[in-house]
Amino acid sequence: MQTRNTFSWTWIREEITRSISVSLMIYIITWSSISNAYPIFAQQNYENPREATGRIVCANCHLANKPVDIEVPQAVLPDTVFEAVVKIPYDMQLKQVLANGKKGALNVGAVLILPEGFELAPPDRISPEMKEKIGNLSFQNYRPNKKNILVIGPVPGQKYSEITFPILAPDPATNKDVHFLKYPIYVGGNRGRGQIYPDGSKSNNTVYNATAGGIISKILRKEKGVYEITIADASNGRQVIDIIPRGLELLVSEGESIKLDQPLTSNPNVGGFGQGDAEIVLQDPLRVQGLLFFLGSVVLAQIFLVLKKKQFEKVQLSEMNF
């Protein structure tokens, strides 16, 4: 009987340990995937990355404003592949605070909003020269049914501060919803981690302010660099504890008097988000042919005019000699 009970408890402990280990592994893998793929935040929470005001939703999490640029051809022919180059400049020497509190290199990401009908070029349509510019980047559609909206990132900023998107222009002959017009292209690009998560909570890449005014009675440094700051409010005698995540530099000390919303930490953010736009013309080949024919006609007319003038001058000269 004693042997049976020992076996049962041993088996139960092993099963519990195994279940906890599996759950922990699933959590780590899932969290790592989410934290390393921040475009998924926008994809999960917004049907369209561009709001009615023109603001790209990535700005909701990346609060600092930084520049971004896009280069596209002035005009393209239907059913041709062209480059859309997104430039996300920043100082390569900068280091950001990572989720684990350590310092690391900045990543970059971008969202490209193309006109309806434009989409990512298939691999067999991309030239070797363009493939070399693209490198090992892997683009994805914002939604399966929104092939004109592309996202990329996070990718190493030191290698991909310029991102080349291979784009296939539509053909109005096969797509009746597309016309030979001038179209806008919108782009958003970020470097570094965001300051706010989609649920409204702060990351450790932003400033933390005091949630109450009073005297700092205690600063406790806990495991992994997390701080607990206890603020004693003299007006009502209550105590407030502010939690500061790891990786941040404190600006206050014990015994210091602080005000409501006073910064408790320095601002660690060295990145930011920017958005821009460009225009592209889907050119009708017949218009190009017509323009070439017109220019050729003008050149020929000029040549015949010069020849006629020389012939007239010769006739005049011969009459004068006669």
UniProtKB/Swiss-Prot annotation:
Heme binds at residues 38, 58, 61-62. Residues 1-35 form the signal peptide. It is found in: Plastid, Chloroplast thylakoid membrane. PROSITE patterns: CYTF. One of its GO terms (molecular function) is electron transfer activity. The keyword Ribosomal protein does not apply. This is Cytochrome f. HAMAP family: Cytb6_f_cytF. Its cofactor is heme. The 4 large subunits of the cytochrome b6-f complex are cytochrome b6, subunit IV (17 kDa polypeptide, petD), cytochrome f and the Rieske protein, while the 4 small subunits are PetG, PetL, PetM and PetN. The complex functions as a dimer. InterPro entries: Cyt-f_TM, Cyt_f, Cyt_f_lg_dom, Cyt_f_lg_dom_sf, Rudment_hybrid_motif. One of its GO terms (cellular component) is chloroplast thylakoid membrane. It is a single-pass membrane protein. Belongs to the cytochrome f family.
